[in-house]
């Protein structure tokens, strides 16, 4: 029984150790990039864009296609001409056939045409009063087809698809930095809650001690009954504040654990980052890096190109369309397979088609006008988005440079508030300070603690926001894309 108790105690101790986690801000950001659901979503969004670009590249390469019809059987009544009777008659016909072909094609971006090489073989066997077998072969055929005056999608894909993939890569890093911002928010939400809990615990002990001192002093008439009741009220309020602080910590801890995709019952303790080193970022430098890296600029450029593509398509479809298909090759037909490839005959094809819209009651012209108006809207929206990004950068950089001074000021205020409260507390104990002064000094200390943590929070949120908007690490001086590993979604 004793051994069992020891084992159970040991297991409980191990479980307690496993459920505890001490984290820094940097570690929280690393864990978010490694295991959070947001990171998983970001990676799959990138992979979707990656494979879309790979598909575009594959479409630019020669394609090899095998077309097969292994078996086809017909049995039906058909109308035929009987030369002996000089009349049309209905006859039953049975036929089995099979076919196969191999095709190689290559698209040309510049012209919008397709070059192809193919070979075909067909087999046919008729059943009935006259059974016969035939093979038809095309040993080789080389051809080219394209629209002469129509819309060329290949030319536009060549402009848009590489830009889309570059935007996808930048967007992946952008989303990762946005996730870092979320991590900062969750981190300091819990840090602030834990700091308030710690203050509430200290305040409860302090108010309890002061109330007991007040009871003793009231007995000798050193303080009034009203002051004693105020001390009692402070103690009761401290108990309520402690309970609310415990609830806030549990909520903040649960939110952080959920975001990091770890056990929701994990007991997380945070280490606040120290005072950051002074780093001034100029607005001009931030704007230059944003124009170079921010995916919003690439997205707007893509939107304009796609609108221009739609306008080009509408204009081309409003005109007459002409296409050409030309091929040269060989073919043969025979009763035996081997003879179907002997002495092939020349096969030539030149086909020119024209489609001219005569009357459409303004449909095509309407499509062109809609495409023009849409292009104007897209260009205006692009300018607005750029201005919005620039405004956000200017405001954030200005706030960031100010936050560094605010942290130093908040830290100094916290030190002074702690010293002032301790001195007021000691003066109250010896009867040289009243209850109002003591309460005021405690409130100032709590407010200074909140302001300091909030200053740290604002600084790091602005720091990672600038990283997100510019995709540049101003502390190390390198572009984030240079250090980003797209395979794992983390920095090398």
Regions found by a protein language model. Name each.
Residues 1-25:
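Bacterial Sec-dependent N-terminal signal peptides
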Residues 159-163, 167-289, 399, 403, ...:
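Periplasmic alpha-helical coiled-coil/stalk elements that build and connect Gram-negative outer-membrane
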Residues 68-142, 270-280, 312, 325-356, ...:
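Small/polar, glycine/serine/threonine/aspartate-rich low-complexity segments that form flexible
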